[in-house]
Design a protein with these regions (language model features):
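Phosphopantetheine-dependent thiolation modules in NRPS/PKS and related acyl-activating systems
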Residues: 2-81
Length: 81
């Protein structure tokens, strides 16, 4: 799966979780940029991403992330094995 495909899939997950069809994420997007991105939304995002890509995050990996770009890089690494 290419970086673009990963981004497109994560974009759709964000739209589903936040129930906002026009939401646009960039590598620099973080929790402060999306009004409803709270701890519950983070859990929903994490579960949806893990399910979509067939991967598992550990707590340390998640707490180290600062923005969507870092999340996309982590997903790419996990998919690659």
């Amino acid at each position: 799966m290419t970086k673009v495909e990963i981004h497109e899939n994560v974009q759709e997950i964000f739209r589903d979780v936040f129930d906002e069809e026009d939401i646009v994420i960039t590598d620099k997007t973080n929790a402060e940029d999306i009004e409803d991105w709270d701890s519950l939304a983070q859990v929903r995002l994490t579960v949806a991403i893990e399910k979509k890509f067939g991967i598992k995050f550990d707590f340390g990996e998640l707490t180290a992330l600062h923005n969507v770009g870092e999340m996309l890089e982590l997903i790419e690494k996990k998919i690659a094995g």
